[in-house]
Amino acid sequence: MTIKNIATKAYTSSATALWGCGLAAVLVLTGCSALPAAPTRPVLYDFGPGPLATVPTDRRAPLAPLALADMDAPGLPEGGNAVLYRLAYADAQQLRPYSQARWSQPPAQLLQQRLREQLGLRRAVLKADDGAAQAREPAQGNKLPLVLRTELEEFSHLFTSPSESAGMVRLRATVVELTPSGESLRGQRVFIVQQPAKSADAAGGVAALAAASSQLAGELAAWVEQVGQ
């Protein structure tokens, strides 16, 4: 074999090797670009920061303490944090979750906190299972505090058309008095509140539900005051 043939063969082998390396690099880069993107984390929502300053003292006489039981949520998936919507114009019987939106806590807990804030503006609010709730009030004729029980039946972003929607909250409230002979019903009422949503998405539904919850809390506090008289 001549020197010329040896050189030609070496050149051909080198070119083939370089071409193979280049092809491998292209395949690696192509494979990397085809990797699935990292999943998007759902956005967490709540009702906002709550009161930002101490509420001025109410000049009216404080109301009797109230025992607030943990809220039940028979109308919602148990323990779920999904932001739910309902298409009343298409399939009103189906609750659907927004895929990229979650509540920071189950809705019943968020609404319970809002109720406690509103009720606490004029009275002490106790936990129904707390020992303090079993203490008799001398100022109230040594009676036990009234007990407020609540059931969240609906908490969804309700669409009546593709462009019209509202945050809807439906809550059943029951006030009972604890007596030596058992519980005595003082009153029961179903509250239904809707607040229009400014946008047809999760953010619009969340804002509408927060506004509806605040309105419901105010209406419920006024009703409980009437029932307790």
Where are these regions (language model features)?
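Sec-exported extracytoplasmic/periplasmic mature domains
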Residues: 116, 120-124, 157, 221-228
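C-terminal motif of bacterial Sec signal peptides marking the signal peptidase cleavage site
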Residues: 29-31
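Surface-exposed short loop/turn segments
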Residues: 34-53, 122-180
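Bacterial N-terminal signal peptides that target proteins for export
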Residues: 3-22
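Soluble periplasmic/extracytoplasmic beta-strand elements of cell-envelope proteins
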Residues: 65-72, 86, 147-151, 168-174, ...
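Short secondary-structure boundary motifs at beta->alpha junctions and helix caps
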Residues: 93-101, 180-222
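Hydrophobic helical h-region of N-terminal Sec-dependent signal peptides
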Residues: 23-27
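A structural "domain/chain start" motif
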Residues: 33-109, 227-229
